[in-house]
UniProtKB/Swiss-Prot annotation:
Task of the protein: Required for maturation of 30S ribosomal subunits.
InterPro entries tied to this protein: Ribosome_maturation_RimP, RimP_C, RimP_C_sf, RimP_N, RimP_N_sf
Keywords noted in UniProt: Cytoplasm, Ribosome biogenesis
Family: Belongs to the RimP family.
GO biological process assignments: ribosomal small subunit assembly; translation
Protein name: Ribosome maturation factor RimP
Keyword Cytoplasm: yes
GO cellular component, one term: cytosol
Encoding gene per record: rimP
Family annotation (PANTHER family): RIBOSOME MATURATION FACTOR RIMP (PTHR33867:SF1)
Subcellular localization, as worded in the UniProt entry: Cytoplasm
Amino acid sequence: MKLSNKVTQLTDIIAPAVAACDVALWGVEFLPQGGRSLLRIYIEALPEDKAADKQVTIENCAAVTHQVSGVLEVHDPIAGEYVLEVSSPGLDRPFFAPEQMTDYMGQTINLRLIQAVGSGSSKRRKVTGKLEQLDDKQLSVVTADGERYDIALDNIDKANLIYQDL
């Protein structure tokens, strides 16, 4: 889940604008796509708002879009045209940092890895399973068939929650 230099630069530029809208910045994706890039910003309710069962609204997304557009116009960090999307992370939320997974212990996550883990027939680069353990260096996932994978955090390319209706 190492962020690219461009994503880190964009995050540093837009974080204050997002905070000014009274929401938390969950993560940033930047996808250069030839003539038109995509900048996707995920916002989350502040912890105190989540405690009061408040969610991100369309009005929050519109406010962040307005604020961030102004900041990006001034700093101009993206060459060429781009599309700006602002939304909540949703039910199948992507994780951008290990600490974001803490609240989802015991839930099912999907991981795309840089290097395959396991051995023999259980060797894989994609792992889906219950998040059993997380520390500052690795996490442990148990798959539906009972296989346990201990995965170094720096081996994770992408991670997201798998929504399951309880």
